[in-house]
Amino acid sequence: MGGGNSKEESSSPSSSSWASHQSYPQYGPDSYNYPPPPTYAPAPSPAPAPAPVPAPSPASSYGPQYSQEGYASQPNNPPPPTYAPAPSPASSYGHQYSQEGYASAASQPNYPPPPSQSQVADRKKFDRRYSKISDNYSSLLQVSEALGRAGLESSNLIVGIDFTKSNEWTGAKSFNRKSLHHLSNTPNPYEQAITIIGRTLAAFDEDNLIPCYGFGDASTHDQDVFSFYPEGRFCNGFEEVLARYREIVPQLKLAGPTSFAPIIEMAMTVVEQSSGQYHVLVIIADGQVTRSVDTEHGRLSPQEQKTVDAIVKASTLPLSIVLVGVGDGPWDMMQEFDDNIPARAFDNFQFVNFTEIMSKNKDQSRKETEFALSALMEIPPQYKATIELNLLGVRNGNIPQRIPLPPPVQSGSSFSSSRIPNFEPSVPPYPFESKQMSSADDIQLCPICLSNPKNMAFGCGHQTCCECGPDLKVCPICRAPIQTRIKLY
């Protein structure tokens, strides 16, 4: 420091003194009678510096760096007579040294602290107090106790069952290559799921009436649902649900594509007509929502978009949605739905992989308990959310009324009449034709949805449509693994 001035000031007593380095001879030790300040006159040589004054602070130190910056702009002013640091840094020369550093900070306005995450969340369309509710129960007893503590004395169950064509091959691994709707003395995955959920929620259902609907068959496709009984009457207990299911399955024609929007909208109609009673919609399905090969990455297919919109709309009602996945999957998109659907009043959607739980090496009773727990563990906080959001016990007034189609069966039921809800007479959107589709037309249609033309071929030579083909892992005709997909037109 100051090396360029040492030659001009060679007449000073000591070329290594502080004054010679600063080119200020008047600050030398012989220019004044004041004793040199003990803290700002240390020589830069290895000689030990004078003892510091008691209790020095970093701001009151007067080393060489300080003196060059502090006094370079004031060469004609003598130093003050004493340099003892003041007790406060604000009154010392340390404050003068750091004045440049603090000047900009002092001139800045006093901004408030940045908003917290909770404040940012308030700007969004849903309350994150009810978003991504943690899985914090470990037994069915805890679930029952939590339901009671939350005041859930009455919970109404709604059941929706997937009758799409993919049920015929998505049991290749998990159901011994049989259709997931195969009927025998052993309950199929749909019957197992209905039984476990029905037994668990039976204690909370006062009237024991269960609205049941099917979707994805040849009469509904991805547009409508059909009621298990004519005129939309409900089933009396889950035992009747199982019995009626066995009556319907042999007479159905599985089709597609898959969309959960119609069954969610039907459940919304049921909740609205009940004047806002709390309901749990259990959707049992073998696959996720149809996604066309033409759908760009990062975008949703029409079926996916309608399903997301329906889930968001359902969060304005006291309605929880539990999707039970049966069969081989895949279920990656359903996990995305469970975790990341935005813009909801509360977290109203829960996905449970039935196959994964029931394939564990455990006793059957323990697997059933684990499944019921996984399906219902989020019901208590979701029920609390409907109370705090003032959704319970009131009509929304802005819910479109969906009318279910009649069951696609010819025979009536032997069960006595239960309750007939106040639905308008159902009018099917598609005219029924008395004659069967010709075999020539059948050959040209996709064997999965039975509605779209065949426009995608696999390596084995068999064909489907471009909406159904991307979701397949094995050919639905010959069961060969699909490694090549070719769009025909």
UniProtKB/Swiss-Prot annotation:
Its EC number is 2.3.2.27. It comes from the Eukaryota. Residues 156-376 form the VWFA domain. It is an enzyme of class 2 (transferase). This is E3 ubiquitin-protein ligase RGLG1. One of its GO terms (cellular component) is plasma membrane. The gene is RGLG1. It catalyses: S-ubiquitinyl-[E2 ubiquitin-conjugating enzyme]-L-cysteine + [acceptor protein]-L-lysine = [E2 ubiquitin-conjugating enzyme]-L-cysteine + N(6)-ubiquitinyl-[acceptor protein]-L-lysine. GO terms for biological process: abscisic acid-activated signaling pathway; negative regulation of response to water deprivation; positive regulation of abscisic acid-activated signaling pathway; protein K63-linked ubiquitination. Residues 34-57, 76-88 have a biased composition (Pro residues). GO terms for molecular function: ubiquitin protein ligase activity; ubiquitin-protein transferase activity; zinc ion binding. E3 ubiquitin-protein ligase that mediates the formation of 'Lys-63'-linked ubiquitin chains. Regulates apical dominance by acting on the auxin transport proteins abundance. Together with RGLG5, mediates the ubiquitination and subsequent proteasomal degradation of the target protein PP2CA. Functions as a positive regulator of abscisic acid (ABA) signaling through ABA-dependent degradation of PP2CA, a major inhibitor of ABA signaling. Acts as a negative regulator of drought stress response. It is found in: Cell membrane; Nucleus. Ubiquitously expressed. Residues 1-125 are annotated as: Disordered. A zinc finger (RING-type) spans 446-479. Residues 1-10 have a biased composition (Basic and acidic residues). A lipid is attached at G2 (N-myristoyl glycine). The keyword Methyltransferase does not apply. The keyword tRNA processing does not apply.
